[in-house]
Amino acid sequence: MFCVAGCGRVSRSHVAPKYSIYVLGKGNDAKEYVLQTSSLDAGKLSPETAGVAVNKDEIDRELIVRNGYYYHFNALTDEFCKYEIAGNRLKPVSRLSLPGFRLENYEWLAADSLLLVGLDASSFAQAQYVLLDVAKMIVRSQGSLNIPYPREPFKSMSLGFVYRRNGLLFTGYSYHHPVGASDYTTSDTFYVAALGWPGMDVRHIDRDARSTYPGGINTVQSYAFTDEAGDFYFMTCPGIALGNRPDLPTAICRIKDDSMTLDKNYFLDLSDSEIANHGYGLWYLGKHKAIVRSERKDLFKGLGDHWSTPHFEFYVVDLLSQQVEKLALPLDKGTRKECVIVAGNRAYIAVNSTQEGNYIWIYDADTGALTKGLQLVGDTDYMLRIDVL
């Protein structure tokens, strides 16, 4: 069940859907929707007529989308679930119990081989992994990542990315200590561990005190990629809504293809560039260029309005020359969103603008042109994620 762009009601068509859009509706008791469409280039869609409503007790926007299926870990039930759109709902296909596990990041190792990394549910201090066969929905293996536990004054940790290359598994992490009853802050250092795969023995650990909080939860937003040369890039995220160390800069870092160590000679300091703010989201355009989504600290008051105030800008960053170029897009709202899809020389960018409406904008990487594509209308407040099916 899906909608070709431009239709107003849920309908069937011989044109297969290519994209998925996750929408948060309006109001205090907002509904959430999943829409599928064959095109992001033009037309209008209304989630209440062209999409399916989501059962918020079972699922939220923290999704892994692949080959028409939606995968979600439910921390309330300790279940990893596989869904598909059938009839007029998002229907569970199968479930796996993963007791005591809390998902932080994932990496596809093969078509049906999905690696989950996360933390123990009781202390958030022990790094763990689960390797799944999602075709059969079975656990192939699971265990611990042998990286150091937090030490005083730190109580917990976060895993910001996971990346496998040949016989190595890389993960970035940082440590946290609580501030009051419901907040935390982060160490002034981030770490990158190279582990043997699949044995998980530690081969090397880098530490870097120039920034902190490497990556983020990639079921919510992208923060890392591999380029054509096999070099791996990731963004540190010390802003108030992630690492909560705004005194440290947001930066792009690199692990070269022929190395198991952090490239200490590469540190693209975005906070010291024209951007001069903290970043939330990183997507690869190709040809050594990437899109960065950045906050505007002069436009929001604090964490309380960080998500609701339109203040996010988009920049194209040249990873080699380290030059940045601001895209002429309306200010976006929503702290963390999976809002960019790159297809060939085009980038589709979902922007929720209070002035110009909710559009998928199309950026031509060859010419620099920006045009409006698909518009989301009706009960649309935020486009929280866009995915290739």
PLM feature segments, named:
Residues L35-L40, Q126-I138, Y184-M200, D247-M260, ...:
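Beta-propeller blade signature
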Residues V54-N67, L98-A111, P150-V162, P214-A224, ...:
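Repeated scaffold domains used in trafficking and secretory/extracellular systems
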Residues K44-K56, L90-F101, I138-P153, D201-R210, ...:
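Beta-propeller fold detector
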